[in-house]
């Protein structure tokens, strides 16, 4: 597992949601800069997209685990 994923797993869900929002805003700014020809480091967009995907995956795993635990508790 990558160190980025390990760091993200240590954070709680609210922090992960904030990170996703911040990264999406950063990605949007980078896209505008690229469209205007101002962006220098376009490879960072790939890294940002991957980090967003990792964070959303962790959030989804937590939601599914919570639903599963609630379902088992109701049996």
Curated annotation (Swiss-Prot):
UniProt-listed GO biological process terms: translation
CDD domains hit by this protein: Ribosomal_L29_HIP
Gene Ontology molecular-function annotations: structural constituent of ribosome
Pfam family, one: Ribosomal_L29
UniProt xrefs under SUPFAM superfamilies: Ribosomal protein L29 (L29p) (SSF46561)
A GO term from the CC aspect: cytosolic large ribosomal subunit
Keyword set, alphabetical order: Ribonucleoprotein, Ribosomal protein
Matches recorded under HAMAP family: Ribosomal_uL29 (MF_00374)
Protein family: Belongs to the universal ribosomal protein uL29 family.
UniProt name for this protein: Large ribosomal subunit protein uL29
Originating organism: Ureaplasma parvum serovar 3 (strain ATCC 700970)
């Amino acid at each position: 597992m990558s160190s980025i994923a390990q760091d993200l797993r240590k954070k709680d869900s609210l922090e992960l949601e904030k990170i996703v929002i911040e990264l999406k805003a950063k990605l949007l700014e980078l896209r505008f800069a690229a469209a205007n020809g101002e962006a220098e480091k376009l490879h960072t967009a790939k890294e940002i997209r991957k980090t967003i995907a990792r964070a959303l995956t962790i959030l989804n795993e937590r939601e599914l685990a919570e639903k599963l635990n609630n379902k088992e508790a109701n049996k």
